[in-house]
Amino acid sequence: MEFKHISVLLEETIDSLNIKEDGVYVDCTLGGGGHSKEILKKLSHKGKLIGIDQDTSAIKAAKERLKDYENVIYVHNNFYNIDSILEELDIDKVDGIIMDLGVSSYQLDEASRGFSYMKDAPLDMRMNREENLSAYNVVNSYEEEELFKILKNYGEEKFSRKIARFIVEKRTENPIETTGELVEIIRKAIPAKFQREGHPAKRTFQAIRIEVNKELQILNKAIEDSVNRLNKDGRLSIITFHSLEDRIVKVKFKELEKPCTCPPSFPICVCGKEPQIKIITKKPIEPSKEEKEINSRSRSAKLRVCRKI
């Protein structure tokens, strides 16, 4: 299948980076290369782009899309490791970093990846297919209490307790092997009147995907490491697609902008923690009405940007 991914908030994200033609930029989520191509258009031959992705299909697609550009370095890795990636490339500081945290259209549409609740496929959901933990492992081996917490915390699923119980009951008969089987279990666990609010499996699938790929843990560390790697006035632009991610970015940015831990009663700061960034987007940038109509998957997208000081 051809790797397809429509870049969300493309123009807004590129503008937010304030690109210098001889700068060094990192696309932490290369995908099909949509954002990267627009960055490269603004770079001279002295500029450089590092494209990171843990999905080999994405890297292959990006190489084809960006074949006319020679100033690209492709890295098959997780942006969790951005610090060591730049270390290995002997790059100290960069001028801008972008993270697009959405699952690509390709990953959702390719049934065998197991991300979609709309298609029956083996339970997988691994962004990096070289990793061991898959959705199958989570669904069939996690304790009921552990499943409940994942569905509640990562999916904000109001019926998380019941869904977890139904999963455990069903797997005692036979292992749950496909997305279709899991969807049926979820449908039975959620009362009919609540199934009118979008697809009943949406939140559960989100929660399991986040657990499989350790998305929230990765994000927290990656933000800190990215800021440390920015030159003065360098920008970090992050696109999120659900409230959990957006909350992490919002809170982490605030921590880095105002890190002082001194009690309010102290006349001066004595903790020694200095601000590292200035938040550019006091409120997140959202897609235009037109973009939401053209690309329904952009509807929940939010862009937050900060500048290194």
UniProtKB/Swiss-Prot annotation:
Intracellular or extracellular location(s): Cytoplasm
Protein family: Belongs to the methyltransferase superfamily. RsmH family.
Binding site for S-adenosyl-L-methionine: G33, G34, H35, D53, F79, D100, Q107
Keyword Manganese: no
Assigned EC number: 2.1.1.199
Function recorded in the entry: Specifically methylates the N4 position of cytidine in position 1402 (C1402) of 16S rRNA.
Biological process according to GO: rRNA base methylation
Short name of one Pfam family: Methyltransf_5
Catalytic activity reported: cytidine(1402) in 16S rRNA + S-adenosyl-L-methionine = N(4)-methylcytidine(1402) in 16S rRNA + S-adenosyl-L-homocysteine + H(+)
InterPro entries the record matches: RsmH (IPR002903), SAM-dep_MeTrfase_MraW_recog (IPR023397), SAM-dependent_MTases_sf (IPR029063)
Chief place of localization: cytoplasm
Gene3D superfamilies: Putative methyltransferase TM0872, insert domain, Vaccinia Virus protein VP39
Domain of life, source organism: Bacteria
Name of the protein in its database record: Ribosomal RNA small subunit methyltransferase H
GO molecular function: rRNA (cytosine-N4-)-methyltransferase activity
Alphabetized PANTHER family for the sequence: 12S RRNA N4-METHYLCYTIDINE METHYLTRANSFERASE, S-ADENOSYL-METHYLTRANSFERASE MRAW
Gene: rsmH
Keywords for this protein: Cytoplasm, Methyltransferase, rRNA processing, S-adenosyl-L-methionine, Transferase
Keyword Methyltransferase part of the UniProt annotation: yes
